[in-house]
Amino acid sequence: MKQDSRFPNLFILDHPLIQHKLTHMRDKDTSTRTFRELLREITLLMGYEITRNLPITTKRVETPLVEIDAPVIAGKKLAIVPVLRAGVGMSDGLLELIPSARVGHIGVYRADDHRPVEYLVRLPDLEDRIFILCDPMVATGYSAAHAIDVLKRRGVPGERLMFLALVAAPEGVQVFQDAHPDVKLYVASLDSHLDDHAYIVPGLGDAGDRLFGTKN
């Protein structure tokens, strides 16, 4: 895991397996089926990395030999909140890693001026819960920042929120950081820039279209 000095709340997950799978996802000739499988696999690997600092407590258990105080994750079960629609493809990998997690959804689409338009919010109970929000792309950063706003407006503090994405543009990371300097943003790659259509370069195309086999 490494950081970029420009963005103190950005963490780049540079594990070789994550980078290997991301390269195959970038390839324009990767099939929908393979893209979907890779998204699940890479999200599972990234989920392992971002949960390494979860709070721990102990639980009394009896092994076949003795009783011990053994470590377990403290507090309520985690919640996974994909940003629709492409974020849904990331929830499978996270649920494979954390099968007891609660799942919410935030529906946001990008208007012609690239600003987010919210159309759906479904969340589990919020008290004392850690939330992992996920969307494959942080392009302009407005949708990601808006999704965090949804939780904060309902009283969830920044220290109980994290955002997980595959690739991000510096422009989007700056927007996210300006809006939520107290929320950690985890990505597999910080790419070069946004083009004139607000697509990430080099990026991996439209993640939703590639995941579901649709045409923009």
Swiss-Prot record:
Pfam families: UPRTase. 5-phospho-alpha-D-ribose 1-diphosphate binds at R85, R110, D135, P136, M137, V138, A139, T140, G141, Y142, S143, D206. The keyword Transmembrane does not apply. GO terms for molecular function: GTP binding; magnesium ion binding; uracil phosphoribosyltransferase activity. Allosterically activated by GTP. Transmembrane segments: none annotated. It comes from the Bacteria. The keyword NADP does not apply. Its EC number is 2.4.2.9. Keywords: Allosteric enzyme, Glycosyltransferase, GTP-binding, Magnesium, Nucleotide-binding, Transferase. Its cofactor is Mg(2+). Binds 1 Mg(2+) ion per subunit. The magnesium is bound as Mg-PRPP. It is an enzyme of class 2 (transferase). Pathway: Pyrimidine metabolism; UMP biosynthesis via salvage pathway; UMP from uracil: step 1/1. It catalyses: UMP + diphosphate = 5-phospho-alpha-D-ribose 1-diphosphate + uracil. One of its GO terms (biological process) is uracil salvage. Uracil binds at I200, G205, D206, A207. InterPro entries: PRibTrfase_dom, PRTase-like, Upp_B, UPRTase/APRTase, Ura_phspho_trans. Belongs to the UPRTase family. Catalyzes the conversion of uracil and 5-phospho-alpha-D-ribose 1-diphosphate (PRPP) to UMP and diphosphate. NCBIfam families: PRK00129.1 (NF001097), upp (TIGR01091). This is Uracil phosphoribosyltransferase. It comes from Burkholderia pseudomallei (strain K96243).
